[in-house]
Amino acid sequence: RFFQNGWNEDNFHFGSRGLTGYCRQMKPENIEDLIAAISLYRPGAMENNFHNEYVLRKEGKKTVEYFTGTQDILKNTYGVFAYQEQIMQLCRELGGLSLVEADDVRKAMVKKKYEALQQYKERFIPYYRDTYHVTQEYSEIVWDAIDKASTYLFNRSHAAAYAITGYISQWIKVHYPIEYWSVAFKYAQDFDYSRYIAEINKTGMCTVRQVDINISSTDVVINFADKALYWAITGVKQVAEKAATQILKERDENG
């Protein structure tokens, strides 16, 4: 729900404005959606409109279509090319190449080494044509689609690492909101405060309270009973840490 609503403030990787907006659009439902979001919300994929294509197919607003023989490999992304690993699998299954050769194809496509690609293209097209009983023209179309996609696809293993870390970050925010936000505020910049407070108010999982001279300290103070965060004394304009320390000393000594 947090990802779907774009409540991603201070979240690892998902906290950017662009990816937050894409999460609202995509409405991720599982870790696979989060991995896809990381991979598809990138310049190359976006220039080819694959990020929107994924959402439309996911929501059933557009028919999911597969090239012959690609469904098992592309079903998790609704027929959309999303990862470099998919390119390798397609070269292996459709073109009869070894995994080492498939990785060579991936590298050559990314670096646009057309001479190196030619030998693999000459093997891929007839193998795919004869094995899957498609036409020569269709085989060439599929090869060209793979070639085009490979130039901008992201590494799925990297995307998975980012997505899992982002999910863990979000899980902590949901289940331990007071602890999460107390740390977030401690390391936040001044321009972060308003966004953080806005999200806290939207989620309603805890509250941020103004400075209380009897409770507040130099850092945000947690009150578990009230599910509240008390603003730091140093958050008051023109009250530096030295002055705040003197205030706390006076409070401790004289009440």
Spans of features found by a protein language model:
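Noncatalytic, beta-rich nucleic-acid-contacting surfaces in large DNA/RNA-processing enzymes
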Residues: 1-255
